[in-house]
Amino acid sequence: MAIKVSIDASGGDYGIPVTIVAGIKALNIFQDLHLYFVGNEPSITTELGKYPSNTLNSRYTIIHASEVVLMNESPAIALRKKKDSSMRIAINLVKTFKADACVSAGNTGALMAISRFVLRTIKGIDRPAIMGRMPTITGHTHMLDLGANVDSKPKALVEFATMGSIAVKHTENIESPTIGLLNIGEEDMKGSEKIRKAATLLKASNLNYVGFVEGNDIYKGIVDLIVCDGFEGNIALKASEGVASMMEHYLKQAFTRNLLTKLVSLIAIPVLKDFKSSLNPDKYNGASLLGLRGIVVKSHGSANIDSFLTAITEAYIEAHAKISDKISLQISKELEHNE
């Protein structure tokens, strides 16, 4: 059976020139994938006309949307006044089970607000959380929340850990993902009362909680999942992106300083390519909005074609694994157990 993914084609900084091409690439990679391209139909048709293929025509559907949620638009305006936006229609397709997942590079706040309104949260989950991948020396780790919730209570952090553990288990084929709680130290007495309380709850749970992790542990790959409040998580994410950008800048500067360094750079090209690839944000694009009654994946607003393709791939994998259903089932079991 085909995996169906709705694409907010008009969303993001670049819209249709990026989302459509990434979609065509995804269709060529995943033979059981069907895409709904949602956005301005004439513009989508024009873009698709650049990539004629008789074999792909039957594997995508164009759905017209007369409105677009702007990147600087308030979530309230997007929710109340733009009911025919490409974002809203793409999410509605998940609500009506026509699509198994949705991908958008649009406004994060609007995407979360519309997703919560249209799809609703899973019973037993107070608030959805955003989970993404972070590069490590061993490959990558997962982290949530990356910005959906500020000042989360201990119970919410445990919910994040539960949802994240299920998602990592079924998308990475890790039977019992290790979980760390982001803190300012590894000792039990370190951190705020909220963090210490969350640690106590996690220790008492059935999750594979291994203890506190510090900021410098994020990139060591010592755990499969790092749990934190959205405030700290978003800062860590942006700091990571900033450091990667700075390192690339310094390397360019160092290797173009004079003739000798330019010659050295020619010798070092293979190493530099591997280095750049390991930190390339395109490889880690596609953050999951966990806790909804449906799968929604958020792409970077400034995503290029390859980066948006990564987000589509994430949605495809989650849809195959039925992540939302598995989270719902586990939370339901826990609610029954606690009654």
From Swiss-Prot:
This is Phosphate acyltransferase. HAMAP family: PlsX. It catalyses: a fatty acyl-[ACP] + phosphate = an acyl phosphate + holo-[ACP]. Coiled coil: none annotated. Gene3D superfamilies: Isopropylmalate Dehydrogenase (3.40.718.10). It comes from Vesicomyosocius okutanii subsp. Calyptogena okutanii (strain HA). Homodimer. Probably interacts with PlsY. One of its GO terms (biological process) is fatty acid biosynthetic process. GO terms for molecular function: phosphate:acyl-[acyl carrier protein] acyltransferase activity.
